[in-house]
């Protein structure tokens, strides 16, 4: 089996993490192979696309976790100009737009207590800096909320947080890969991207870093596994103490008769789902189902999402149905991502859960930089794949809120 193509790094998985890693690697001068099987249920393609530095759940008060979210959101400001320069045809607000976020609550005491806690966290300059928020959130009453979203129920109160955006995950992923290919074409000198379709498996001897795609062998100095909820075949040899499972999210896309929803802020709640406006649709979600690798749209899932959406926004009853997307989120057994080296020459990024589109671009870049000889920042040490499992930070629920 001589003559196998040789690369500086092989990246397995072309979702948001792998695509971001590919762009970062070619910009470092690396020769990159990006392998992907295009399996149904890839979370990057289905995710609603909330990019927010302020979490509503999952241990949001932990300084280390808050720091990761803040840095990853800030990374968008650096990444998007690079992508726009390399892929000018796709530049503009269709990929990413800062629209702000309405965190809303009914009269329920627990819901309003959550909003009060967010307000308190962001009331000081220190708190805002910790979360990467530029201005204090603004209290909004029912009439102000309905100026943004007339379809919402009339008894809501909440906060408006300006530093929140929304992203079309599938579009950004495609543009990252296009940008990586363009960089290689423009700069040459040994760098470049080769996209290899197919299901990859790692070599079984733990000595080489060969990757097999069908009957073809690829060789590299290092491998980055970014396969989301799917374990890369051969990765069982890592023997990690933390497992990753798929959690299905069904997300419904609707269209209002009057359209023009692209500038509306994200609407988020503490337990009744979320709404996002895009140029041609409204996205509502999402389920949170432990059903293995079943990527089907189900009647029960659509019913759960639509029932919650209509209870929150009765005015959506007249909206037209566009589609339902399904993503299998990779959720770790302790609810936190896994980022770093797992064996000589092999690195891993997975377990991003509902935070994939927020965390993926920066974590993918940092992981491939480490794979190519750089040091992973100390602030990511607590996410080491070889860590002792912590207490879980995410639990199942029918409707999931947050940064899905």
Regions found by a protein language model. Name each.
Residues 188-210:
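A conserved short coil-to-beta-strand element within the FAD-binding core of flavoproteins
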Residues 90-106, 128-182, 287-291, 350-351:
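Helix-loop-beta segment of a Rossmann-like dinucleotide-binding subdomain
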Residues 50-144, 148, 310:
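Dinucleotide-binding Rossmann-like beta1-alpha1 core, especially the glycine-rich loop
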Residues 1-8, 27, 396, 401:
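Extreme N-terminal leader/targeting segments of oxidoreductases
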Residues 7-33:
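N-terminal Rossmann-like FAD-binding beta1-loop-alpha1 element of flavoenzymes
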Residues 315-404:
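C-terminal catalytic lobe of FAD-dependent flavoproteins
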Residues 10-12, 218-230, 364:
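Short hydrophobic core segments
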Residues 20-28, 37, 49-50, 92-97, ...:
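Active-site substrate-recognition segment that forms the wall
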